[in-house]
């Protein structure tokens, strides 16, 4: 059984992202990893949706969780007629897809794929939950393999012995970038901004880098400019929650200011991922506003006085003039020429 997660860090292995088995989905709680290794156990697809909304898993984790949630929904309705099962799964598709507004279109593609697998299983009389899980694993294999192709275009852009700055947690591309670098005999060091308020850079990106044997340093979110100036950063790279066809990149809030700093110091910014055909322009993206209370604390410890207000946009938009290239599985594209990515019929 081919597994594209082979050789990657613990938290990037499929079962340690999200996994369905016997009427339950377990999701690694990335809010507390690596201090604690705990899994949130969901007994219904609605609980999976809520776990995604509550940031139990982040970056690309929600897409795996969503697929496993669809398998769980199939288990929930297994005693119903075929027509009733299909109706139940269509409703679950909408529920899970709407977990977070900014990523709705990508999430809908994932859930629709699970729905198609369910329809085929119903026609063939196979267990629908297992068919969806098999589809989810195959989809993960395809995605990981696709990201591995992205890594093959990204790693040559990094000087051997150089310095890379990241942002938030790019999930699979972080692991694949490091795996590809090791296979090609290239070494570099990484600076990871901590990424408040959930500290994904400090807890997730830095842990993956360390687990895979790389020199990694965590910095606070207000240090990128200083570090770029003093530590000879060669490249800033991040993944994206959406890459609009007009060249705007939607990613974890803070990406814009790092790209501005990189531009100021003449450091290239490379964004990894495929353009989103569902987002012709940035105007089709809804920026999620989350509970502002989270900006008034750090890992559960209150840092601001009672009565002080918080402000918490989950994402920001980086304009194309700040981006040196979009690194895809088909090569590196100018952010001003993303329609060319689809010229091959993809």
Regions found by a protein language model. Name each.
Residues 106-160, 186-188, 192-236:
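Ligand-binding beta-strand-loop-alpha-helix segment within the catalytic cores
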Residues 195-346:
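Conserved phosphate- and dinucleotide-binding cores of soluble alpha/beta proteins
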Residues 10, 14-124:
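Long amphipathic alpha-helical segments
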Residues 31-34, 39, 43-52, 132-137, ...:
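Glycine/charged-rich beta-loop-alpha catalytic/anionic-binding loops adjacent to active sites
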Residues 54-69, 103, 165-169, 312-327:
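Conserved phosphate/anionic-ligand binding catalytic regions in large, soluble enzymes, centered on
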Residues 40-55, 154-156, 298-307:
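Short, hydrophobic/aliphatic alpha-helical segments
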Residues 173-183, 259:
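Histidine-anchored nucleotide/phosphate-binding helix
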């Amino acid at each position: 059984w081919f597994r594209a997660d082979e050789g990657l860090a613990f938290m990037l292995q499929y079962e340690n992202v999200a996994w369905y088995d016997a009427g339950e989905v377990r999701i690694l709680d990335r809010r507390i990893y690596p201090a604690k290794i705990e899994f949130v156990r969901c007994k219904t697809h609605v609980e999976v949706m809520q776990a995604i909304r509550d940031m139990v898993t982040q970056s690309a984790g929600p897409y795996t969780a969503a697929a496993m949630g669809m398998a769980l929904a199939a288990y929930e309705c297994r005693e119903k007629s075929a027509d009733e099962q299909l109706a139940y799964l269509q409703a679950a598709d909408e529920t899970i897809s709407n977990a977070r507004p900014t990523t709705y279109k990508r999430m809908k593609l994932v859930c629709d794929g699970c729905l198609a697998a369910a329809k085929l299983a119903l026609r063939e009389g196979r267990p629908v939950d297992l068919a969806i899980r098999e589809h989810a694993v195959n989809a993960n294999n395809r995605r990981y393999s696709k990201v591995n192709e992205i890594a093959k275009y990204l790693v040559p852009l990094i000087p051997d012995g150089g310095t890379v700055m990241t942002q938030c947690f790019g999930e699979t591309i972080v692991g694949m970038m490091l795996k590809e670098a090791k296979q090609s005999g290239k070494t570099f060091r990484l600076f990871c901004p901590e990424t408040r308020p959930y500290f994904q850079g400090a807890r997730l990106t830095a842990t993956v880098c360390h687990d895979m044997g790389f020199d990694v340093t965590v910095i606070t979110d207000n240090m990128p400019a200083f570090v770029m100036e003093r530590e000879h950063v060669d490249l800033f790279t991040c993944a994206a929650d959406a890459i609009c066809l007009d060249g705007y990149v939607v990613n974890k809030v803070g990406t814009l200011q790092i790209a501005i700093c990189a531009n100021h110091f003449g450091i290239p910014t490379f964004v990894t991922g495929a353009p989103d055909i569902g987002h012709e322009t940035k105007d089709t993206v809804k920026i999620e506003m989350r509970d502002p209370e989270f900006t008034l604390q750090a890992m559960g410890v209150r840092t601001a006085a009672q009565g002080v207000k918080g402000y918490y946009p989950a994402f920001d938009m980086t304009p194309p003039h700040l981006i040196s290239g979009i690194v895809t599985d088909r090569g590196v594209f100018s952010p001003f020429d993303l329609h060319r990515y689809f010229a091959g019929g993809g």
